[in-house]
Amino acid sequence: MNWITNYVRPKINSMLGRREMPENLWIKDPSTGEMVFHKDLESNQFVIPSSGHHMRIKAKDRLRFFFDNGEYTTLEAPKVPLDPLKFRDEKKYIDRLKDYRSRTGMDDAIVNGLGTIEGLPIVATVQDFSFMGGSLGMGAGEAIIQGFEKAIELKRPLVLFASSGGARMQEGILSLMQLPRTTVAVEMLKEAGLPYIVVLTNPTTGGVTASYAMLGDIHIAEPGALIGFAGPRVIEQTIREKLPEGFQSSEYLMEHGMVDMVVSRLELKATIARLLKIMTKQPANSDAPAPQKPDADSKAA
């Protein structure tokens, strides 16, 4: 054994050896298969630069991109019974909740943020699909109501970002009870004369579309979002017919009058700020992009 064996060879092996790389450095575009560097994706608000595909986004990132300078404060999540039905499927519901809380750092699927957009104070309520598919249970329902109550208290508009698979089956009727409760909260906000804008993101399905997600003064959808009560596969199996191309997509729903506009995530802040300033009779920002004029066909329609 000599110094080449003892020193040089290990050095060469360490330099040329296989290094462990984080698994999430590159993210695959579901629409094209293109690999995108994670920092490029994050700097573009998790919108694929080449294809415009909108990736799912966590609640805290959504709030950071939405509010001025990324500054906001969150409301403490309301405390609710964790597992009143003692439900169990493949594992105990209480254990499933603990697992999601550990993975996401969230108490439940809803985060309420207070901040400003273009200087206008608002309340933003964000549903996070990464927490049990954004499902609506007691915790999420209470947090939504908390957001509406805070908006009424502070006399601020409320912007809600919906992203959910529907009611949380592990909570049974206690989950379904959140549909009328959140609907009442919407009515309270409207009675207070405060604007309510809903942003429908991918996916927005199930019971949320039968309650607060479709009760806004204005409905904006992100491009390519799946929006509907039941999924297209379930509908096809039920009616035994092939659905139209793009059925339940944002663009399809706008063409058929179910949403008011489809707006890229990159333009959401400016668009919502302009709408809220009009609705609250404040001077609009001249730097914000102006709405497109309707073409001849839409005028005729």
UniProtKB/Swiss-Prot annotation:
Molecular-function GO terms, alphabetical: acetyl-CoA carboxylase activity; ATP binding; carboxyl- or carbamoyltransferase activity
Taxonomic lineage from the root: Bacteria, Pseudomonadati, Pseudomonadota, Alphaproteobacteria, Hyphomicrobiales
Organism, scientific name: Brucella canis (strain ATCC 23365 / NCTC 10854 / RM-666)
Protein name, entry field: Acetyl-coenzyme A carboxylase carboxyl transferase subunit beta
S-S bridge residues: none
Family affiliation: Belongs to the AccD/PCCB family.
Listed pathway(s): Lipid metabolism; malonyl-CoA biosynthesis; malonyl-CoA from acetyl-CoA: step 1/1
Keywords: ATP-binding, Cytoplasm, Fatty acid biosynthesis, Fatty acid metabolism, Lipid biosynthesis, Lipid metabolism, Nucleotide-binding, Transferase
Enzyme Commission no: 2.1.3.15
EC class of the enzyme, as a word: transferase
Pfam families: Carboxyl_trans
Subunit structure: Acetyl-CoA carboxylase is a heterohexamer composed of biotin carboxyl carrier protein (AccB), biotin carboxylase (AccC) and two subunits each of ACCase subunit alpha (AccA) and ACCase subunit beta (AccD).
Functional description taken from the UniProt entry: Component of the acetyl coenzyme A carboxylase (ACC) complex. Biotin carboxylase (BC) catalyzes the carboxylation of biotin on its carrier protein (BCCP) and then the CO(2) group is transferred by the transcarboxylase to acetyl-CoA to form malonyl-CoA.
CoA carboxyltransferase N-terminal domain sequence ranges: 25-294
One GO cellular component term noted in the UniProt record for this chain: acetate CoA-transferase complex
Cellular localisation: Cytoplasm
UniProt keyword annotation of ATP-binding present: yes
Reactions catalysed, as given in the entry: N(6)-carboxybiotinyl-L-lysyl-[protein] + acetyl-CoA = N(6)-biotinyl-L-lysyl-[protein] + malonyl-CoA
GO process annotations (BP): fatty acid biosynthetic process; malonyl-CoA biosynthetic process
